[in-house]
Structures are given as C-alpha cells and as structure tokens.
C-alpha cells in the first residue's frame, strides 16, 4: 500500500516507500519471477608486500573486473590484502537463498586458481578469508529504478553486485 509498510514488528508511514530488496525480491509473492538471486563469492589473501603491488600494477589501489564467464573483480584492501571475487556459483532452483550457499569450496578454489593465473607474483600467499552472498540479476540483465508519484511507491534493483555506483545509470 502506498506510503505504508507493515512488518512483523510494526508499521511505518512515509510519503515515499522504496522497495530495494535486491536478491530477496523473489521471496515476495507478486514479484517471484522479476529478479534472480545469483551468488558472488570472494577470497582475501594474507597481507602482501609493497613489492607485489608494484609488480601487479595495483600499487595505486586500482580496482578491476572483467567479463569472462566467471565474472571476476578485485582490489587491494586497506591492510594490503588482495580481495578477489567472482560469480562461478550455480543458480539455485526456485531462487533459493540459504546461508550455506554463501561459501562454495569449488568456487573458492577456482577463484584462487584464477587469482594465481592473473597475478603469478602472488605465489603461495595464503587465503585467509572466504565469503559470499546473493546479488540480484534481472532476467533481462537490465538494472532498473521506478517511481510512481500517484502511489508514492518506488523500487530500485538488479544491480548484480555493482550497487550504488550504477544507480545513476538506471
């Protein structure tokens, strides 16, 4: 209902209500088929020396991604770890989202292997962290933002992990 959100713990009234439920959108009965949750997983190394960052060409903290089948992305963290992620996890039937999907040993190994292929200077640096979560993909792969001034209802989503940085493109 426009201007009204009811939850298990109470009701909120507002002039505008924005639904930004991303990967959890399929849990809403009327929106079940609008977005598909896909998992993005990440690994992070132990802190790496400045010499690695210089050799890798990432000494100025550039971020990167590419468009291979397993979309990958990475960046240097504030404590000099290499945070590296990708989307090699399969879609789960019925748009299922479960905590156990946040980690996938096969994808973790694939990410580690890909990181070593792209940045051989990383050598045997230890992987100290591994995590993941669901992001939303529209079935046509187009992110969107909508607003209906008549009802005060708005929605935004399907940013496939690119998040707020791409909201101005919707």
What are these regions (language model features)?
Residues 2-3, 11-51, 55-150:
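Active-site substrate-recognition segment that forms the wall
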Residues 94-102, 155-170:
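A conserved FAD-binding loop/helix module that cradles the flavin
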């Amino acid at each position: 209902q426009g201007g009204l959100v009811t939850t298990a713990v109470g009701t909120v009234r507002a002039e505008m209500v924005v639904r930004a439920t991303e990967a959890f959108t399929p849990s809403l009965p009327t929106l079940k088929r609008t977005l598909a949750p896909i998992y993005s997983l990440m690994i992070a190394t132990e802190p790496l020396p400045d010499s690695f960052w210089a050799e890798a060409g990432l000494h100025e903290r550039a971020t990167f991604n590419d468009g291979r089948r397993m979309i990958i992305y990475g960046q240097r963290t504030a404590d000099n770890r290499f945070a590296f992620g990708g989307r090699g996890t399969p879609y789960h039937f019925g748009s299922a989202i479960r905590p156990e999907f946040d980690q996938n040993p096969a994808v973790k190994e694939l990410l580690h292997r890909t990181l070593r292929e792209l940045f051989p200077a990383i050598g045997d640096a230890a992987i100290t962290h591994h995590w993941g979560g669901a992001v939303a993909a529209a079935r046509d792969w187009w992110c969107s933002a909508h607003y209906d001034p008549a009802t005060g209802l708005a929605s935004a989503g399907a940013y496939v992990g690119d998040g707020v940085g791409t909201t101005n493109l919707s």
